Regions:
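GST-like domain detector, emphasizing the conserved glutathione-binding G-site
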Residues: 1-127
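A generic structural-conservation signal
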Residues: 29, 153, 178, 198-199
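Conserved beta-strand edge residues that scaffold enzyme active sites
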Residues: 33-36, 158, 203-204
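Active-site-flanking alpha-helical
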Residues: 73, 165-166, 199
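GST-like fold's C-terminal all-alpha helical module
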Residues: 97-191
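Long hydrophobic alpha-helical segments typical of transmembrane helices together
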Residues: 182-207
Length: 207
């Protein structure tokens, strides 16, 4: 088994794991305590950044969750998860993939750090970046008017990558993220068996 994915519970690793599960891929999953650079220092020998997810596929090594997910659908497809250049929604598909991390997940990383890892150090940043994240959901909420999915009238990688930000918002207690259209959309996505399985993977320390 050449394909390996390293991840932590509730991390951005959910994106490629969910993608792999939807595609029925054969892969090895290594779950670690968060953050692994602190609690599993030997991981730095595998990924010098100490970040998750990390994917190894033969000689290929990748560190970015959206890029890994896109690699999987393009390398191991064809898959309906991919929107191809000949489809009308291809530009929107690409935009949502980049939007998922650059626009949505970025402010959440600040909240995660100062709410869970270093509580009390920067409470103003937690409040400010939480508001900033919620304000950035306008486009998503509007796009989901009368839509079940983001692109091409089907479930795609765009739904996987963007919805992770909402899943993380729930974990961080940012309840304002669940606007009506977004809640309807995520209720549907998060009931998918592949997502439920992906969320169920946990680090189990050796006894």
């Amino acid at each position: 088994m050449a394909l390996k994915i390293y991840s932590c519970e509730n991390s951005r690793g959910v994106r490629p794991i969910w993608t792999a599960e939807e595609m029925g891929l054969d892969y090895e999953l290594i779950m670690m305590p968060f953050p692994p650079r602190i609690f599993m220092k030997e991981y730095l020998d595998t990924n010098m950044l100490g970040t998750v997810p990390f994917m190894v596929d033969g000689s290929v090594k990748m560190t970015e969750s959206v890029a890994i997910s896109q690699y999987l659908v393009e390398k191991y497809g064809p898959s309906d998860l991919q929107v191809t250049p000949d489809e009308d929604d291809y530009p929107n598909y690409l935009n949502w993939l980049f939007h998922s991390d650059a626009t949505l997940t970025f402010p959440q990383t600040v909240v995660l750090r100062y709410k869970l890892q270093e509580p009390g150090v920067a409470d103003a940043a937690v409040e400010g970046y939480s508001r900033w994240f919620v304000s950035r959901l306008k486009l998503l909420e509007k796009t989901l008017d009368n839509r079940e999915y983001l692109c091409s009238n089907r479930f795609t990688l765009a739904d996987i990558c963007v919805s992770y930000a909402i899943n993380l918002a729930e974990a961080l207690g940012i309840e304002q993220a669940f606007k009506p259209n977004i809640k309807r959309w995520t209720d549907n996505l998060f009931s998918r068996p592949a997502f439920i399985k992906s969320k169920g993977f946990k680090y189990e320390p050796e006894t």
